[in-house]
Design a protein with these regions (language model features):
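Dinucleotide-binding Rossmann-like beta1-alpha1 core, especially the glycine-rich loop
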Residues: 43-167
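Short beta-strand to alpha-helix junction loop
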Residues: 102-115, 138-148, 173, 186-205, ...
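N-terminal Rossmann-like FAD-binding beta1-loop-alpha1 element of flavoenzymes
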Residues: 2-29
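Glycine-rich FAD pyrophosphate-binding loop
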Residues: 22-42
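Active-site substrate-recognition segment that forms the wall
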Residues: 44-47, 52, 56-95, 220-230, ...
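C-terminal catalytic lobe of FAD-dependent flavoproteins
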Residues: 163, 299-300, 325, 341-425
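Helical element adjacent to the flavin cofactor pocket in flavoenzyme catalytic cores
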Residues: 147-159, 178-240
Length: 425
């Protein structure tokens, strides 16, 4: 197993390419856009947030979804139109509720472990991605939300992540620009933020230096495996269809992973959960002074923030179950702008760039990392809202699995050669 294809050039695909190239594999990366990180990894919330490791498989999620179903500006919006994909996903989601605490603890462990890889890679490759190590402040507007956060903190502690409660006065000291009245907060000093798009593109340049063949504008339409060889079909708008063969493949294709897994005989029940963001351009001194330096997560509105350099302020959130729909809806963007005006009144929101992306979410909220049914098929996908946070550690994990598989194959070949030698003497 020497040649490996990676399908998908977002954060998980590029980090996987890096982890494999560093282990000496010959890697080819396929991406359907002209550049890396042009879909889900383009303009997310920016948080590297182990403190947001709580999985969504909690009864309150279903209750809120039903309550907000007819509210177009709700943080969680479910299109009531049924589909087998949506029904099966929610059925598995509810079945996963028994593992709520276990999966939250495990996600926290992964998120903490991911930091050392991501920061080390950024330093080794000299990648500037507006990294800010100033912690993340979770804010709560009522006692109910704050009390639930206390229970979540106990689970995060089991996963190796300490965070502490703060009073409204302490919240103001942590982030003086935050306006409004709050019940309390939780502050995680070890969390950080950064620009996922800048990091992914910086690492994409690094993998090229390591010898990875990066193929952009490549619309992969089919992947097949006979367990010995992988065949990838690529459609082109201005050229005939091309066929490529490799020893193995790692599927890192975001919401398209479900389709490719089906072609390969695997079931990866990812649902595309749309999220929105706005990037506020801080074009004047008052806006720059009035924007927060510390990253925030508002529990009531489910919005997160990141300060990206001096002149950009990112606000992101919402979860929309509406199929493979990438439309940017004005009624979903307006609550984000209104939130900025309410919480940070000194920011001028005249210049705002809206964006929407599809999070690849598994029903149990845990990424699919590891081998498929075929011995030469692997997955690193389904990270949901924590792709940026978890990408480095899952890339390292899947690279270890691939390396172990390759070592086992080499051992089999050596063993077979030894046996043949004994027979012939």
């Amino acid at each position: 197993m020497k040649t490996i294809a990676i399908v998908g050039g977002g954060i998980t695909g590029v980090t996987t390419a890096y982890a494999l190239a560093k282990r000496g594999f010959t890697v080819t990366l396929f991406e359907r856009h002209r550049y890396a990180a042009m879909e889900t990894s383009f303009a997310n919330g920016g948080q590297l947030s182990a403190s947001n490791a709580e999985v969504w498989t909690h009864p309150s999620t279903i209750i809120k979804g039903l309550k907000w179903m007819l509210k177009s500006d709700a943080p969680l919006l479910v299109n009531p139109k049924p589909s087998w994909h949506k029904i099966s996903w929610f059925a598995e989601f509810m079945a996963s509720m028994t593992a709520y605490e276990k999966n939250t603890v495990e996600t926290a462990k992964l998120a903490v472990a991911a930091r050392q890889h991501l920061f080390a890679w950024a330093e080794a490759e000299n990648i500037d991605f507006d990294l800010k190590k100033q912690g993340i402040l979770h804010i709560y507007r009522d006692k109910k939300g704050f009390d639930h956060a206390g229970k979540v903190s106990e689970m995060l502690a089991k996963g190796g992540l300490p965070r502490h409660a703060v009073t409204p006065d302490e919240m103001k000291a942590i982030e003086p620009t935050l306006a409004g009245k709050y019940y309390g907060g939780y502050f995680t000093e070890s969390d950080s933020t950064g620009d996922i798009h800048k990091f992914t593109n910086g690492l994409a340049q690094a993998v090229k230096r390591l010898g990875v063949r990066t193929l952009y504008d490549q619309n992969v339409t089919d992947i097949q495996s006979d367990s010995n060889q992988v065949t990838i079909t690529v459609a082109h708008t201005d050229a005939p269809t091309s066929i490529h063969t490799f020893d193995s493949v790692v599927v890192c294709a975001g919401v398209a992973s479900k389709q490719f897994a089906s072609q390969l005989g695997d079931r990866v029940n990812i649902y595309p959960v749309k999220g929105y963001s706005i990037t506020v351009n801080l074009n004047d001194a008052e806006s720059q002074a009035g924007a927060p330096q510390v990253s925030l997560l508002d529990d009531e509105t489910k919005l997160v923030t990141s300060r990206l350099g001096d002149d950009r302020f990112r606000v992101a959130g919402t979860a929309e179950f509406n199929g493979y729909n990438r439309d940017i809806r004005a009624d979903r963007i307006k609550p984000l702008v209104d939130w900025v005006n309410q919480c940070f009144p000194k920011i001028n929101t005249r210049s705002v760039v809206p964006w929407a992306g599809l999070r690849p979410m598994m029903p149990n909220m845990m990424p699919r990392v590891g081998r498929g049914k075929a011995a030469n098929v692997f997955y690193n996908t389904g990270h949901g809202h924590l792709g940026w946070t978890l990408s480095a550690v899952t890339a390292d994990m899947v690279a270890e699995v691939v390396s172990a598989q390759a070592s086992a194959e080499r051992a089999t070949i050596i063993s077979g050669s030894t046996n043949l030698a004994r027979v012939s003497t």
